[in-house]
């Protein structure tokens, strides 16, 4: 593998992998390695965790039957090249602790399933907990049982990634209240060391109180009040509540009246200032916040039928959007709340676009003590927890941390208002001539979307210093990572 493009090729090849279940490449390995698991770890930003899953020395002399077994429709994944070229090392993490307290309750790790279809039956939750998830927030339930539509999902695609964003039309649980309570009871009995959270939704104060009481009686650890589902078919439920401060306050009080365990208020992002309903929740007795729920959306229009997605007998409706695309929105709301003088003292369970250990720890660095995941599980399965746990432990070890709690809030001081940013210095981009392939992408973007600070000839791109403002658009669009940052210097005349 050509060294100067090695990291880029490894990334491209691992993203090409279809991440098969019961993968043929692993079955074909004569040495007992798990190449599918190896590739998956790299895909989920855990290359050091991949180290123990194959032996580069053995693989270097192997004829790679794993590659011949690959079922990819457009050529085999270069498994052997990736294994023998990866810069990684074994890191012992035996003394790293992922345990953390959340809302006064100890969790073996902060990684939870969020309230959705991925946590909607006993068997599903049990499978997830067996694989290592620290807890589950069971699919929202109440006295109201909805009818669901078909189909109920659509996606926003980008190149060959089908899940940049994900839209759903699902509502609350379609099981009876008795069934849901029975499942929660079994889960807590069979998994006493895991955190079981009941997500509830009532139509009036009496229902909120009753649901809280019944949930505590079956042994759940925490109650989450769902004030934020954006696609409820019934008025006065879901995000309609989360946008109404009076209802938020009344329903939190009603929930607290029915139980003695911690209560979280789940916030809607379909509002300008999340601090307002969050403060109303806390002042009414909530013990913490969960954020964010999904963003109201339309994912697209079929320009031949003029139907939107997902099409339900020719129609659709505005509903919740999730996945990687909403992560920046979630991080912004988390930051707003954790910088609030009152809210910063209360625990937040972070939700929105989390796929990897790195995503999860970004939420924690901005103040979350806990995170929740749905869309990534729908796309890749519960197995993503393996690299969340491994990757987080390796990161903590490399950083010299003993406990994951040391990361919480670490990034907050680096986020300031725009008027406090340094405007007296600049970082100019530098083109790596060895890596540059002269494709001209930087030139096009700089000329048409920047400051006309790149000249282009047969020799490739050249930065025009007098025009460059250091915006770094060129660096971000370069397809081979051939543009780097230079040393920060004072602006001319400053």
Q: Which role fits each region the language model picked out?
A:
Residues 1-6, 74-95, 394-402, 406-421, ...:
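Flanking helices and flexible, charged tails adjoining ferredoxin-like Fe-S electron-transfer domains
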Residues 146-162, 300-318, 365, 376-401:
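C-terminal helical cap(s) of enzyme catalytic domains, especially alpha/beta-barrels
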Residues 126-131, 135, 203-349, 357-362, ...:
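Alpha/beta enzyme core
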Residues 2-23, 48-62, 419-438, 452-470, ...:
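Ferredoxin-like iron-sulfur electron-transfer modules
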Residues 39-108, 116-119, 133:
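Iron-sulfur-cluster electron-transfer modules
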Residues 19-44, 59-86, 363, 441-459, ...:
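Iron-sulfur cluster-binding cysteine motifs and their immediate structural context
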Residues 74, 117, 141-143, 204, ...:
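Glycine-rich beta-alpha junction loops
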Residues 91-196, 202-206, 388:
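N-terminal capping/small domains of soluble enzymes
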């Amino acid at each position: 593998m050509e060294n100067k493009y090695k990291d880029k090729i490894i990334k491209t090849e691992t993203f090409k992998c279809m991440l098969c279940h019961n993968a043929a490449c692993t079955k074909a390995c004569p040495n007992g390695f798990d190449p599918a698991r190896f590739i998956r770890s790299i895909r989920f930003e855990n290359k050091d965790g991949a180290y123990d899953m194959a032996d580069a020395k053995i693989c270097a002399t192997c004829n790679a039957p794993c590659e011949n077994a690959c079922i990819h429709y457009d050529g085999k994944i270069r498994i052997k090249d990736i294994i023998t070229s990866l810069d990684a090392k074994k890191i012992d993490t035996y003394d790293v602790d992922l345990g953390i307290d959340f809302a006064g309750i100890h969790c073996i790790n902060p990684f939870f399933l969020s309230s959705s279809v991925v946590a909607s039956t006993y068997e599903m939750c049990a499978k997830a907990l067996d694989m290592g998830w620290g807890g589950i927030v069971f699919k929202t339930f109440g006295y109201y049982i909805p009818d669901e539509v078909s189909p109920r999902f659509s996606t926003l695609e980008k190149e060959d990634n089908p899940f940049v964003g994900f839209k759903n039309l699902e509502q609350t649980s379609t099981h009876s209240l008795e069934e849901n309570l029975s499942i929660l009871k079994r889960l807590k009995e069979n998994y006493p060391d895991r955190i079981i959270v009941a997500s509830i939704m009532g139509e009036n104060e009496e229902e909120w109180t009753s649901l809280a009481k019944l949930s505590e009686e079956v042994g759940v650890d925490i109650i989450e009040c769902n004030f934020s589902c954006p696609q409820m078919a019934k008025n006065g439920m879901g995000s309609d509540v989360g946008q109404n401060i009076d209802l938020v306050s009344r329903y939190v009080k009603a929930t607290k009246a029915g139980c003695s365990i911690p209560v979280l208020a789940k916030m809607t992002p379909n509002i300008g200032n999340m601090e307002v309903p969050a403060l109303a929740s806390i002042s009414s007795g909530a013990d913490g916040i969960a954020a964010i729920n999904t963003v109201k959306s339309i994912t697209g229009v079929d320009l031949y039928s003029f139907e939107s997605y997902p099409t339900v007998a020719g129609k659709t409706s505005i509903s919740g959007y999730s996945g990687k695309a909403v992560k920046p929105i979630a991080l912004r709301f988390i930051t707003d709340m954790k910088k609030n003088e009152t809210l910063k003292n209360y625990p937040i369970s972070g939700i929105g676009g989390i796929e990897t250990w790195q995503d999860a720890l970004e939420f924690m660095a901005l103040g979350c003590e806990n995170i929740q995941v749905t869309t990534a599980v729908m796309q890749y399965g519960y197995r993503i927890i393996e690299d969340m746990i491994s990757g987080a432990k390796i990161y903590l070890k490399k950083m010299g941390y003993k406990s994951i709690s040391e990361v919480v809030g670490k990034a907050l001081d680096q986020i300031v208002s725009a008027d406090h940013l340094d405007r007296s210095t600049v970082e100019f981009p530098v083109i790596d001539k060895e890596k540059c392939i002269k494709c001209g992408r930087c030139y096009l973007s700089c000329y048409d979307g920047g400051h006309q600070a790149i000249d282009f000839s047969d020799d490739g791109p050249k930065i025009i210093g007098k025009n460059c403002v250091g915006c770094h658009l060129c660096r971000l669009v370069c397809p081979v990572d051939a543009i780097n940052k230079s040393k920060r210097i004072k602006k001319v005349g400053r």
